[in-house]
Amino acid sequence: SRSELIVHQR
């Protein structure tokens, strides 16, 4: 999901 990608962008 996109949420996982956002977490990685932190």
UniProtKB/Swiss-Prot annotation:
A GO biological process held by the record: killing of cells of another organism
Protein name: Antifungal peptide
Function in brief: The synthetic peptide has antifungal activity against B.cinerea (MIC=20 uM), F.oxysporum (MIC=20 uM), A.niger (MIC=41 uM), C.albicans strain 01U (MIC=13 uM), C.albicans strain 38U (MIC=7 uM), C.parapsilosis (MIC=105 uM), C.neoformans strain L26 (MIC=209 uM), C.neoformans strain L30 (MIC=209 uM) and T.rubrum (MIC=3 uM). Has no antibacterial or cytotoxic activity.
Domain of life according to the entry: Eukaryota
Keywords: Antimicrobial, Fungicide
The species this protein was found in: Cenchritis muricatus (Beaded periwinkle)
Keyword Ribosomal protein attributed: no
Keyword Disulfide bond attributed: no
Coiled-coil annotated residue ranges, if any: none
